[in-house]
From Swiss-Prot:
Top EC class for this record: transferase
Pathway given in the UniProt record: Secondary metabolite biosynthesis
Keyword Nucleotide-binding included in the entry's annotation: no
Position of the signal peptide: 1-18
Family: Belongs to the methyltransferase superfamily.
Induction and repression of expression: Expression is positively regulated by the fumisoquins biosynthesis specific transcription factor fsqA.
UniProt protein name: N-methyltransferase fsqC
Matching Pfam families: Methyltransf_33 (PF10017)
SUPFAM superfamilies linked to this entry: S-adenosyl-L-methionine-dependent methyltransferases
Entries under PANTHER family matching the protein: ERGOTHIONEINE BIOSYNTHESIS PROTEIN 1, HISTIDINE-SPECIFIC METHYLTRANSFERASE SAM-DEPENDENT DOMAIN-CONTAINING PROTEIN
The encoding gene: fsqC
Alphabetically ordered keywords of this record: Glycoprotein, Methyltransferase, S-adenosyl-L-methionine, Signal, Transferase
Function comment: N-methyltransferase; part of the gene cluster that mediates the biosynthesis of the isoquinoline alkaloids fumisoquin A, fumisoquin B and fumisoquin C; as well as small amounts of fumipyrrole as a shunt metabolite. The products of the cluster lead to a brown coloration and are important for growth and conidiation. The nonribosomal peptide synthetase-like protein fsqF, which lacks a canonical condensation domain, is required for addition of a serine-derived dehydroalanine moiety to activated tyrosine but is not essential for the subsequent steps leading to isoquinoline formation.
Length: 366
């Protein structure tokens, strides 16, 4: 990474020191106007139970990746972001740092910016700071599945962009991607909506599912800004996704599954982490692997595992540029802008390591 690009680690971002600093008496106003709408409410656990059962019944067994993203899981994922082996974080930050003015050029004053899977919002702060420096009035909506982590991130943002002086209006949605798409259909807003999906998160889904998600969001009339990873160095990918921090993150999903099920069906001591590359899907896959023969009893159902059998936890696609174009076209979208990471030292092929794309609905598609 270029020496003039700030490292992503740590909060607040480097520019935040110049932000407005309210005194203690204004703390109520600073946080009082924060709106967080919970679209999941009390149905979260109940909705995950059938997904867990269905995944264990399947021939290709898997658990919902949503199990990874509770408050503890997000904390463990932040440790991954700080790991030197996890190349994505600083590479994406460098790309955003170098191209942020071009990336936000299509966002006009009065527009709505919705971030999917907002996480800790460090990158968000850079983007909002740039929009504010351009004197644009923006309605920013952060969407994430964990309410506690979402509120924490929003308060960090509001400390930098206080409602009393900032041109950025901040709001939160506790929602899955499906919840968010449905909410956007019901709430089209008065201006254009740009959806921001960073961190290679779209690539947690196989290409056909990724296309369906893009289609569902484009159908709301929004455009998308996607950040994706095109690394083709399998050794580099393994170091990034199979280290100790990743293993803790993935295995935490079993603890969360027990919480959701209200049982101790998954004894973490009986499972190990396994990572491998799936060449057919251009994806790295993480699994829970049985350390011995196991019998799981969940409700009235019994699931038998032989030693070494696996349950898939999460995937991460590493798609070259032509594959990204195909995925977007399958969704009825057209990639109109590319911002590429210029560092070609990553990967055993000449595929560039990372890029952001702006996707609009194809005017000639059905």
């Amino acid at each position: 990474m270029s020496s003039n690009v700030q490292d992503i680690r740590g909060w607040p971002p480097p520019f935040a020191n110049a932000a407005y600093q309210p005194d203690a008496s204004s703390r109520r106003a600073r946080y009082g106007g924060l709106q967080v709408h919970n679209l999941r409410q009390a149905t979260t656990a109940n909705s995950l139970v059938p997904s867990i059962i269905q995944g264990l019944r399947a021939e290709d067994r898997e658990l919902p990746s949503l199990l990874l993203w509770d408050d503890q899981g997000l904390s463990l994922f932040n440790a991954i972001l700080d790991s030197p082996e996890y190349y994505l974080a600083n590479k994406e930050w460098a790309l955003l740092h170098n191209e942020v003015h071009n990336i936000v050029a299509s966002i006009s004053s009065g527009d709505r910016l919705v971030e999917l899977g907002a996480g800790n919002m460090k990158k968000t702060a850079l983007i909002l700071h740039t929009l504010q420096s351009q004197r644009k009035y923006i309605h920013y909506i952060a969407c994430d599945v964990d309410r506690v982590a979402l509120q924490r991130g929003l308060r960090n943002l509001q400390a930098i962009f206080p409602a009393s002086t900032s041109s950025i209006k901040i709001q939160g949605l506790v929602a899955t991607y499906e919840d968010c798409a449905a909410w956007l259909q019901r709430n089209p807003g008065s201006g254009h909506t740009s959806l921001m999906w960073l961190g290679n998160s779209l690539a947690n889904f196989p290409p056909p599912e990724a296309s369906e998600y893009i289609r569902s969001f484009l159908s709301t009339g929004a455009s998308l800004i996607l950040a994706l990873d095109g690394c083709q160095d399998h050794e580099q990918i393994a170091r990034a996704y199979e280290g100790p921090s990743n293993q803790k993150f993935v295995l935490n999903g079993l603890r969360h599954a027990n919480d959701v099920l209200g049982t101790d069906a998954f004894d973490v001591r009986n499972w190990s982490f396994l990572g491998r590359w799936n060449p057919e899907l251009w994806m790295h896959e993480s699994f829970y692997a049985a350390k011995r023969d196991l019998t799981l009893k969940i409700g009235r159902e019994t699931f038998v595992f032989r030693k070494g059998e696996t349950i898939r936890s999460i995937r991460s696609g590493k798609w070259p540029k032509p594959k990204v174009v195909d995925i977007c076209r399958e969704a009825g979208g057209d990639v109109v802008d590319w911002w590429m990471n210029p560092d070609e030292s990553y990967g055993k092929s000449t595929t560039l390591m990372g890029y952001l794309a702006r996707v609009l609905i194809d005017s000639v598609s059905d």
